[in-house]
UniProtKB/Swiss-Prot annotation:
The gene is panB. This is 3-methyl-2-oxobutanoate hydroxymethyltransferase. The active site is at E181 (proton acceptor). Its main location: cytoplasm. GO terms for molecular function: 3-methyl-2-oxobutanoate hydroxymethyltransferase activity; magnesium ion binding. Pfam families: Pantoate_transf. NCBIfam families: panB, PRK00311.1. The keyword Metal-binding applies. Its EC number is 2.1.2.11. Binds 1 Mg(2+) ion per subunit.
């Protein structure tokens, strides 16, 4: 099996070929996802909520993400593997480099940072030191206390224009990938068309280059409230996890998921 690379993702964008990605936290699920055809995985700081039982991602540490990154890498050696930089782990460019190096040594191919234009110096420094970076705009969970909860971002014209400008400058600074979370579909389309780098959406409609879901949402095992954009693929697959993942991939690649009911206007 060939290893998935960023050049492939860029080619898929040019070919308008949509791709499906998932979070993963252990070797067993990583292997299962890869065997069904998932080629991009994220060790998300969402592990704080899905695995550790916290009500936000803020308590997650670099050591936590590194531990799970090592496990996922062993389970899916050929996937393009992203790892989240946790809250306050990239407060300065120097701190970001130290922690990014730890995650890269753990097996990540790329690190993901949440934030706008204020991150440009950090992204530039990492890119110059051979650390690939994925940006993250829209609803950035590490900023939940500023946002006042998990709310759709970019609905007002000023906020939408600022998000688009942030996306442009992050790409100019050296970001190779962008996650866009919980934004209106029209804004997601503007960002996806404006950037030359691939854009992965979550709660951003079916107009982005790729889609990502937290694995617990995709399999319907999230306790309590589930996001509007999530879909329980396991419930549509007679309880067969492998069939659920294949269905997820098929619906993303076919532009079926996310549907209008999963989309913010």
């Amino acid at each position: 099996m060939k290893t998935t690379t960023m050049s492939q993702l860029r080619q898929w964008k040019q070919e308008k070929r949509k791709f499906a990605t998932l979070t993963a936290y252990d070797a067993s699920f990583a292997q299962l996802f890869a065997e069904q055809g998932i080629q991009v995985l994220l060790v998300g700081d969402s592990l704080g909520m899905t695995l550790q039982g916290f009500d936000s991602t803020l308590p997650v540490t670099v050591a936590d993400v590194a531990y799970h990154t090592r496990a996922v890498r062993r389970g899916a050696p050929h996937c393009l593997l992203l790892a989240d930089m946790p809250f306050m782990s990239y407060a300065t460019p120097e701190l970001a480099f130290t922690h990014a190096a730890e995650l890269m040594r753990a097996g990540a191919n790329m690190v993901k940072l949440e934030g706008g234009s204020w991150l440009c110096d950090t992204i530039r420094m990492l890119a110059e030191r051979a650390v690939p970076v994925c940006g993250h705009l829209g609803l950035t969970p590490q900023s939940v206390n500023i946002f006042g909860g998990y709310k759709v971002q970019g609905r007002e014209e000023v906020a939408a224009n600022q998000l688009l400008q942030d996306a442009i400058v992050l790409e100019q600074a050296g970001a190779q990938l962008l996650v866009l979370e919980c934004v209106p579909v029209e804004l997601a389309q503007r960002v996806t068309e404006e950037l030359t780098i691939p854009v992965i959406g979550i709660g951003a409609g079916n107009v982005t280059d790729g889609q990502i879901l937290v694995m617990h949402d995709a399999l319907g095992i999230t306790g309590g409230h589930t996001p509007k954009f999530s879909k329980n693929f396991l419930a549509h697959s007679a309880g067969d996890i492998r069939a659920a993942i294949k269905l997820y991939i098929e619906e993303v690649e076919g532009g079926i998921y996310p549907a209008e009911e999963h989309t913010f206007q």
